[in-house]
Swiss-Prot record:
It is found in: Secreted. The lineage of its organism: Eukaryota, Metazoa, Chordata, Craniata, Vertebrata. SUPFAM superfamilies: Snake toxin-like (SSF57302). Shows low hemolytic activity against human erythrocytes (LC(50)>600 ug/ml). Is also cytotoxic against human umbilical vein endothelial HUVEC cells (57 ug/ml) indicating no differential activity against cell lines derived from neoplastic tissues. This is Toxin C13S1C1. Belongs to the three-finger toxin family. Short-chain subfamily. Orphan group X sub-subfamily. GO terms for molecular function: toxin activity. InterPro entries: Snake_3FTx, Snake_toxin-like_sf, Snake_toxin_con_site, Toxin_cobra-type. One of its GO terms (cellular component) is extracellular region. Gene3D superfamilies: CD59 (2.10.60.10). The keyword Metal-binding does not apply. Negative results: does not inhibit growth of reference strains of E.coli or S.aureus (MIC values >200 ug/ml).
Amino acid sequence: MKTLLLTLLVVTIVCLDLAHTRICYSHKLLQAKTTKTCEENSCYKRSLPKIPLIIIGRGCGCPLTLPFLRIKCCTSDKCN
């Protein structure tokens, strides 16, 4: 019985992913959608300020913004 409980505990920890990783889309313009498991707790989406529907890139973390780029950061899985 103790072995069964220990096994269930290990499976629960693995499934819950207590390492606090984030799943983010990680691809550039005109590439197929890919995902990446990131250690950072945020994802970003980079686009042009004048044309926000054209997404230049996506990835892990939250990079610094530049005047000619729009960067949206978020903190849930596949939010970018």
